[in-house]
Swiss-Prot record:
Belongs to the EPSP synthase family. MurA subfamily. This is UDP-N-acetylglucosamine 1-carboxyvinyltransferase. Signal peptide: none annotated. One of its GO terms (biological process) is UDP-N-acetylgalactosamine biosynthetic process. It is an enzyme of class 2 (transferase). Gene3D superfamilies: Enolpyruvate transferase domain. It catalyses: phosphoenolpyruvate + UDP-N-acetyl-alpha-D-glucosamine = UDP-N-acetyl-3-O-(1-carboxyvinyl)-alpha-D-glucosamine + phosphate. GO terms for cellular component: cytoplasm. It is found in: Cytoplasm. The gene is murA. Pathway: Cell wall biogenesis; peptidoglycan biosynthesis.
Amino acid sequence: MASFVIEGGHRLSGEIHPQGAKNEVLQIICATLLTAEEVTVNNIPDILDVNNLIQLMRDMGVTVAKTGVDSYSFKAANVDLAYLESDNFLKKCSSLRGSVMLIGPMVARFGKAMISKPGGDKIGRRRLDTHFIGIQNLGADFTYNEEREIYEISAEELKGTSMLLDEASVTGTANIVMAAVLAKGKTTIYNAACEPYLQQLCKMLNRMGAKISGIASNLLTIEGVEELHGTDHTVLPDMIEVGSFIGMAAMTRSEITIKNVSYENLGIIPESFRRLGIKLEQRGDDIFVPAQDCYQIESFIDGSIMTIADAPWPGLTPDLLSVMLVVATQAKGSVLIHQKMFESRLFFVDKLIDMGAQIILCDPHRAVVIGHNHGFTLRGGNMTSPDIRAGIALLIAAMSAEGISRIHNIEQIDRGYQNIEGRLNAIGARITRI
């Protein structure tokens, strides 16, 4: 188990580029299974979850070639269907949550799929019902093999239908869309997720020959086609990294420029940080964050305490609440952080309290943060990263703290952040991997 040793108290300065979006690229790679032709994907981040999925594709018989620094080509002309029933395949799926998005493409093109319960962050219950019910509505049969603890999915023919999703699940919508593009007839999906990464998937599928309309809305209409073809696709910058860097600059009172952020796809993320009192400027497609000695949390118009809560797009992504919580510890004022979508993502706050933060954990979903206004510097400490997003929040806290901190289990951070210590050290951080 690797660790970071962080020497806190150093200001950052310079430019930093966000990596390609993890949550987009996992969908895009799975979608390459929908055609026997070559698909080239650019701006792929070099992170653990993505690399594991790429290796899984190779193991499945997909021809994968690295064509550039961050570019890969995928050609799924000779998929090994027998391998999909092997214990090795199922074991790998169990450690990678993104593997659930293999179901839609596999059932659509090959008529069957097998998958174990996928892994990923331990951040609470993450239901698969939306995936399964949606694909069942298209005509697939699902069975659970208790002996092997796997899901078996099969379909002689998928047929278009109308469905209303019980939740606007991003991965659930992606899975259903990937199945529906090769189904016979028309499919309509109401209460579909509409975040930028899902829009990117739909646009790529249309370039491959799919017929999807309603992109960027919560009502998608899909006319099934006989086959899809190859294409090129470029992944968006990771909005979670962009938000993490904004928070990092505020906590360390640093001046940085975040380059090529695809500002129009950030939604309310910039405004949410402004509510915490953080100044930032859009400069073309870059974000400039000036150094601030203090930042004051806004109140609501009636004077009540500010609440920052997550919601399905175009609401605030839940992946940034951990960052906003830690940033609030050094703000002037108080804020209620309300994590609605997952019930155990706030359970890392005890580590921040040990560092000197003033936080009241109300319940598994809510925490009140009383900011120090930089009047009291957090203390360095020893901590373990429980998941990707808590890990980066703890790293931000350690970078602003007085003294030395150690973060263990940084493999969690590596799952979502590419060479994070190298990129941060290049602009003034002091982080050592041991």
